[in-house]
Swiss-Prot record:
EC numbers on record: 2.1.1.-
Class of enzymatic activity (EC top level): transferase
Keyword Methyltransferase: yes
Entry GO MF terms: RNA binding; rRNA (adenine-N6,N6-)-dimethyltransferase activity
Residues that bind S-adenosyl-L-methionine: N23, L25, G50, E71, D95, N110
Broad class of the protein's primary localization: cytoplasm
Keywords: Cytoplasm, Methyltransferase, RNA-binding, rRNA processing, S-adenosyl-L-methionine, Transferase
Claim: Secreted is one of the keywords in the record: no
Functional description taken from the UniProt entry: Specifically dimethylates two adjacent adenosines in the loop of a conserved hairpin near the 3'-end of 16S rRNA in the 30S particle. May play a critical role in biogenesis of 30S subunits.
Top-level taxon in the UniProt lineage: Archaea
Name used for this protein in its record: Probable ribosomal RNA small subunit methyltransferase A
The encoding gene: rsmA
The species this protein was found in: Thermococcus kodakarensis (strain ATCC BAA-918 / JCM 12380 / KOD1)
């Protein structure tokens, strides 16, 4: 696999585009483990974002019934179409954040790091069975953080509201070419059953985590403008903010259930309306 990768690179005099986060995974064992973690079989339709030079796409094509690969770099798209003859792979040229995703039940990807967050939120808005994704290590650690952890963040809370996330493997820089500046990690995501998923007001979550180390009441007072409140209205509501559930707890200690309590209280008080739920 590694030899094939570098022969393609030399053949096309290819220089990875760092702006697109092109760091190609070159360790076959990691690729194989991720396919096994996803439990890919012939009945599965798999989505891959950022296929690069096909080192993951190729083995996926041998296991899955159908593979969709979304690639933004037109050079890479042309190379993939020339070098491989996959009868069950459809390459979609475009930006994964802008193109319409096809129907799929599993995702396996080595994601470009700069789009990790929006891709994750887009994924959580979809129905799927399992995703096995490679992220920057720091991002992965935030994704799986628990309430009260030092790196618990808006990302942690929003993932926790919709899915179960587990960091299953750390990957050193040497597993990629060119070597990235940071280590990476594999995260397995499985959506919670529909009855356990929590839809949260995204504006409220952003307002709270803008001041994640503040108390809940203090964070709301500081970020009232993010709820669409004028300065005068925010001053009027200071006493309401002091009475919210969990008012004296730090924001980074809140679970999705806690934030839902706060949201319901603020709706009853007429502070916020039923904005569209987050992904």
């Amino acid at each position: 696999m590694r030899d094939r990768l570098f022969s393609i690179i030399y053949k096309y005099n290819l220089h990875p585009n760092r702006d697109l986060g092109q760091n190609f995974l070159i360790v076959p064992d990691i690729i194989e483990r991720n396919i096994e973690r996803a439990e890919v079989g012939e009945k599965d339709t798999v989505l891959e974002i950022g296929p690069g030079l096909g080192v993951l796409t190729d083995p996926l094509s041998k296991r899955a019934g159908k593979v969709y690969a979304i690639e933004k770099d037109c050079r890479i798209v042309e190379i993939l179409r020339r070098e491989y003859n996959w009868p069950n792979v459809e390459i979609i040229e475009g930006d994964a954040l802008k193109v319409e995703w096809p129907e799929f039940n599993k995702m396996v990807s080595n994601l470009p790091y700069q789009i990790s967050s929006p891709v994750t939120f887009k994924l959580l808005s979809r129905e799927f069975e399992r995703a096995v994704l490679i992220f920057q290590l720091e991002f992965a650690e935030r994704m799986v953080a628990k309430p009260g952890d030092k790196n618990y963040s808006r990302l942690s809370l929003m993932v926790r509201a919709k899915a179960r996330a587990e960091l299953v493997e750390r990957i050193g820089k040497g597993a990629f070419w060119p070597r990235p500046k940071v280590d990476s990690a594999v995260v397995v995501l499985e959506p919670k059953p529909p009855e356990e998923r929590i839809d949260l007001n995204e504006n409220l979550v952003k307002a709270l985590f803008q001041h994640r180390r503040s108390t809940v009441s203090a964070a709301l007072k500081k970020s009232a403008h993010m709820l669409g409140l004028s300065k005068d209205k925010a001053r009027e509501l200071r006493q309401v903010f002091s009475r919210v559930p969990h008012s004296e707890r730090r924001v980074f200690q809140l679970s999705p259930e806690d934030v839902l309590e706060i949201e319901e209280f603020l709706k009853k008080e007429g502070v916020i309306e039923s904005y569209p739920a987050s992904p």
